[in-house]
Curated annotation (Swiss-Prot):
Top-level division of the source organism's lineage: Bacteria
Signal sequence annotation: none
Keyword Nucleotide-binding: yes
PROSITE patterns for this protein: SECA, SECA_MOTOR_DEAD
Enzyme class label: translocase
Family designation: Belongs to the SecA family.
Keywords: ATP-binding, Cell inner membrane, Cell membrane, Cytoplasm, Membrane, Nucleotide-binding, Protein transport, Translocase, Translocation, Transport
Reported function: Part of the Sec protein translocase complex. Interacts with the SecYEG preprotein conducting channel. Has a central role in coupling the hydrolysis of ATP to the transfer of proteins into and across the cell membrane, serving as an ATP-driven molecular motor driving the stepwise translocation of polypeptide chains across the membrane.
The protein's assembly and partners: Monomer and homodimer. Part of the essential Sec protein translocation apparatus which comprises SecA, SecYEG and auxiliary proteins SecDF. Other proteins may also be involved.
EC number annotated for this UniProt entry: 7.4.2.8
Classification of source organism: Bacteria, Bacillati, Cyanobacteriota, Cyanophyceae, Gloeobacterales
Name of the protein: Protein translocase subunit SecA
InterPro entries recorded: Helicase_ATP-bd, P-loop_NTPase, SecA, SecA_CS, SecA_DEAD, SecA_motor_DEAD, SecA_preprotein_X-link_dom, SecA_SF2_C
GO molecular function, one term: protein-exporting ATPase activity
Amino acid sequence: MAWWNKLFGDPQERKVKKYQPRVAEMNALEAEVAALSDDQLRAKTAVFQKRVADQLQGVDLDALEIRERRRRIDVALDGVISEAFAVVREAAKRVIGLRHYDVQLIGGLVLHEGQIAEMKTGEGKTLVATLPAYLNALTGRGVHIVTVNDYLARRDSEWMGQVHRFLGLSVGLIQQSMTPSERAQNYAADITYGTNSELGFDYLRDNMATNAGELVQRSFNYCIIDEVDSILVDEARTPLIISGMVAKPAEKYMRANEVATALERNTHYEVDEKQRNVTLTDEGFIAAEQMLSTEDLFSPRDPWAHFVFNAVKAKELFNKDVQYIVRNDEVVIVDEFTGRVMPGRRWSEGLHQAVEAKEMVTIQNETQTMASITYQNFFLLYPKLAGMTGTALTEEAEFGKIYSLEVTAIPTNRKVVRTDMSDQVYKTENGKWQSVAAEIAEMNKNGRPVLVGTTSVEKSEVLSALLKEKGIAHNLLNAKPENVERESEIVAQAGRKGGVTIATNMAGRGTDILLGGNPEYMARLKLKEVLFPALVIDDEDAFSPMMRLLNNGNSRGTGFAATSKKKALPKAEIFPCELSESTKQQLKAAVDYAVAMLGADSQPALQVEELIAVASEKGPTDDPVIQHLREIYRAIYKEYQVVTDREHDEVVKLGGLHVIGTERHEARRVDNQLRGRSGRQGDPGSTRFFLSLGDNLLRIFGGERVAGLMEAFKVEEDMPIESGLLTKSLENAQRKVETFYYDQRKQVFEYDEVMNNQRKAIYAERRRALEGQDLSAVVREYIDQTVDEIVRAHVNAERPPEEWELPALIQDLQQLIPLLENQLDAVKLGEFSAVELEEDLKSQALLAYETREEYINAIQPDLMREAERYFILNQIDTLWREHLQQMDSLREMIGLRGYGQKDPLIEYKNEGYELFLQMLVEVRRNVVFALYHFQPQYNPPIDPDYVDSEYV
């Protein structure tokens, strides 16, 4: 396509150009806005809100279809865009000392239009989000900013939240440890920061609430997703599931593990690494059945197939220190994209239990799904969705087809001068690792910082051992608990002179790597070093009491070791220099003042983290503790900055940060994220990938051609080969994998779309009952439809009355409605036409309902409404759970329809629809039955003035 671009220009450049006139308007307003006082600047928000409200006056937005609602809001906001962006730019300059560059204004416009902005590492994505967030919050309908972990959500809400608060908007933050009331309060804010999982689980929990007071979220409006590729692509196949515990057949998992251990690969079973699946051969079935003393693994009375297949998968496809680690008698999943551990996350369908049996740890209970949704369908609930990432263009087609999101590449503020060197491929793993270690040693000799990306915990430790042999000091960042708790600290100093950092999957790491080191972060760590021992409650686990839950696997989280926060302090070598005596004295005085004001050993760790975060920013504050800490923070920062600035210049002369990739990832995007760690904001840098024929990508997706070349030329194990053919083969392999996984995600989306339509319908019905919107009318509908279904089951309108099954009809109706006992006569009913019969029975059923309503409300006013709400919610929840299981079973077996020349997806849609209709029939019938049958107990109030002497 290069000739096309030369002829017509780069389409991305053309896209960006259309925003230039708007940016020119904003720049023209800059001097005028800068002349405003703080109060005048803040008052602009109320002016904008009124102008937007005037535009929307008389429009019932909630009554509009989603696309029309978004269009109306965008038209209203269009009149204030340039002024609003100019105001946010000035506020950021005053409050946090950052001014939006023109390219960041373009990024803000792209996000406001509901697109994905591709912005390179270090280009200030976090700051860009303040622009569209402020603008869209002017409607009062709320904005959600989504990050990949709690730490980033908290950091961004504290840091960027200062800009919004300065301008008079409220800022909310959703964290794992919050109570429902705290969540509701934070969701009610103008702008709310949170993680994708917390927002998704809150949505599911809201749709399991038993009274309206438990709801925490309001209607969705606008969402900005940071690291959008990580959430909408990498996590797309992972559903959010809320489940309940069911009994575990632990002995079956243990026995199946023994069978899997005895079975041999390629004899008893075959492994498809590409599909991540296993298949038993005929010999395998026979051997397994003999070992288990059963005639059939699929026997309904004593099924074993599910357990054996999972045990073989656990043996062959799930490796310790790659897909999971073992900690505190638990199997803890490692996120393959970020390298973080995920306590509380479990593989479903018995797979986690199979891995527990393999590792001989306690086998935990199985779970039953109560509610679930994929990220794909969750984020499509927002009328307007936008995202930011450093790498999106490689997935542009997927974003367009599944999410209807356009991708626009935002130009960098300074030209990228990084050198990306060609890949080196080695015959063996050992040859590759030796060469990586040699390259690190060469760079380290000159003091040039090196960042090495690995794909698993196991491989990071192999390299770490090699570097120890060579006497090269280095930092290790992987999912092991002892490394995770120092994550930000390790990344913050990765650009120091002579620094060597080994990291497992750098995607999504939130701290910038600055050449020479990050003085701001180091100054914050210095405050942490002295404040935590003085202020934090003794023996409080990392991130407060909730962290204990995370480390026991009872909740979801981002993996920190259960180490006392007082002990989890930065190592001394991170600091660039010893502080001067006067600064040390000033620091001691600030800590003493904080202790005097707040109390020794009295604060939760999160509270102290927040104190340090606010002290290190520039927002206005009246808090004397923060004022003292801010003063000393600035003094420490200045001393550290002298050293880091000097180191920065030295590292630039050496060539900047050198990034080494030790394996090509399945997605080019993740490789690009690793490369993007070098050469940020115009700094020099270089990258190189070292590969071997044993790497998963080459081994599974077409390394035979390269292996053949190496054999033909008798290449030694420590001799690398570089060639255009090789690079092309690797890129083709990655494209194959990307296409393969895209097809899988597309299939997940298509199948979940069936569930999504059902989910929307059932949740809407549930919300109608929960919020009590005329429950009597809902129940009358249920009665009407239930009687209709019973009549049609026994009466064929095209047949004469003599052929109607009237005795059976009467029996069914009297079982449903006891008040109709002895009220129905088959002879009289036979005199009606089918239509008249139906109308007569419906009117009798409704009369019986009104009689019941009068009787029940006489016991306690409005008791009937409460009963209706309870029975509707109870039946929807119970039958929806059963329906989810049925749909899972249908999904598992529907693929076999392909062998019968039928489209499995169409079959799934049709049969799933039938199951859903049947569930709705059961919900209605069960609710009607319960309302006609339940007997409330009458408990008369006791008159305290009356005491019967007989009982004294």
